[in-house]
Amino acid sequence: FFGRVMDSTSLPVAIQNAPDYLGVGLSVKGLMDLQQRHPNFTLLKGEGPAGTMAEVIRSMQGKLSVFNGRGGLELTDNLRAGCVGMVPAPECVDRQIRIFELMEEGGTEAESEAERIYQEILPVIVFVMQSIEHFLCYGKRILAARLGLDVHDRLPSMTPTAFGLERVQ
């Protein structure tokens, strides 16, 4: 499927590879094969552990720019692994931007501050990343609470629990 899409254009192509969430995805070898056959495959949004992203980056030898998602889990380690950036969930975007800036700055003091900020937001990331449904239900509520917005669910959707709503606050 990806190859057919890539063959239909000369534009650079990005894909999202989320095997842990979708139950199907491309292995590191599969990504390498796809990129060799389709040089316009230039960007990957991975959805995996930082160690997996490091292996993808090493194996691709600079032929593929790699971002990771996963709501920002392992944010600092993903940047250390060579990800060019992250596409995290927006609940803590202001703090995630600061972490990225500090990691880009480099040095012991900047990285220590990045780790400190990451430790502050980690409970939020872990809370929302329990499942896709949980992420959609509670992630939007955390962001809305931070922005002072109302939440409007589209059905079908997970119904928040009283306990979950307490955690959002």
Task: List PLM regions with ranges.
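Catalytic alpha/beta core domains of metabolic enzymes, predominantly
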Residues: M6-L11, P19-I132
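Long, low-complexity C-terminal extensions of enzymes
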Residues: P160-Q169
